[in-house]
Amino acid sequence: MNLLLSFVILAFGTAVFGLPLTSKRATICNGRAELCSRSYGNTTFLGSHNSYAVSTDIFAVGRNQEVSITAQLDLGVRFLQAQAHQWEGNLRFCHTSCILFDGGLVVDYLKKVKSWLDAHPNEVLTLLVTNPDNVSLRDVWKPAFDSSGVTPLTYVPPTNPMKRGDWPTLGSLIDSGKRVIVFMDSGADGAGVDFILPQFKMIWEPPFSSTDPNFPCSVDRNEGPLSVTDHMHMLNHNLNVNIIPIGDGVLVADRANAARTNSVSSIMANAGGCAPLAAGKAPNFVMLDWVNVGEGMKAVNMLNGFA
């Protein structure tokens, strides 16, 4: 009877969440004991927009951050967003053009992330990579993840897409060793690379590149078959300023007002504006420029129910 019970428990844990059961159990998850029993789909994470675009040069118009990837993670960022392009035969993190801002090789970026994860074994991290050139997942993206050592840490859900309410707990992800969730905006069809998940089938976004500090909310990008309320959602809480208001204009990240944009009051107002579209749920990801400025982590703690 005991053998049968053990078999049932093992099968249940593997089948429901796609996670192997281990004897250890995390007691602190993403810095909080309370988060160990919290579903990934019911947790809010601090995010970094164009996380690779790091510079303190005020004339670097393509910058969005001013502290390193490691420093961002040390500040509490657990959602890293980055856009990639094939340039000069290599996959590099760049936005629009690598001439405008070259964030370096994707594999080098991932190696930095892997080093940080190795030093912080009780952390769940999400990566959102955008793939406007539709670079091959199997031939280009997967080798970068493999070479960096990140692939063994990636989580593959038992169903794709996965409903917001069906995700495992942070504790389960950490205990399993599968604590990196990877989403991609375009080209993630699962063919041969099952750990790169289609973003818009599981996460919806409000409009991006906002120049309005009120961040009016609407469902701007998502895909079926899941309902909007079965999606997770993120806040594109990064403000832009039009520096050449002619034609389509030229938008750059608004550093001058970063403290106001990244304040608790601004973030909470944005979250409140999107909540009616998400069945009253808090956002899963709060994506900011200039994560070292303002009160991003304080707002995320509040959204997670911690005063």
Regions found by a protein language model. Give the residues of each.
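Fungal secretory targeting signals
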Residues: 1-25
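Catalytic cores of phosphodiester-bond hydrolases, prominently lipid phosphodiesterases
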Residues: 19-307
